[in-house]
Amino acid sequence: MAFPKPIANTRSATGIPTGKLAIWWLLASEIVIFGGVLMSYLMHRMSHDEWAFQSMHTSTLHGGINTFVLLTSSLSAVLAHNEAEQGNGKGAAKYLYFTIGGALVFLLIKSHEWYNEISHGYTITASPFWSFYYVAAGIHASHVIGGAIVMFFVARGAAQGQDLHRVENAGLYWHFVDLVWIFLFPLLYIAK
């Protein structure tokens, strides 16, 4: 008895593989979430002068290093996709593990940064700025964690030569996570 193809390998009515279409729908919903947070942040920042003072206490060094880490991890996601396109599952897995390593480094730096800020009294309840800061950065960090978990399972399958099409989908998600950080970094760390 032949089993039907898994749905993620089939094509939708648009001709786009259903797995890729699902990722694009997920990213569209994430844009709504992050877009709302960012627009709310901008509106509050423009109408509250004390936000500039509060933002002076964020660590531009930590944010800058994390930006470099995420951009580098995005490069390794691209290299993973190239390996998957060539049918090299082990190579794709290797680069996905590098990407996961970047996620872990990002989270370690973010944890250190938050520890320093909290120990200096800059908690989520200290001011509206710090509430937005922790919510925006926390939502982003949760997406970094989620992306790393997904990439781990995709890398495991890729190492065995299975479901190499998922490498691209994981990469699309990871690039979105990086893109969100590209918006958060200047708003939270540079615009002081």
Name each model-derived stretch.
Residues 1-192:
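...captures the hydrophobic TM-helix bundle architecture rather than a specific catalytic motif
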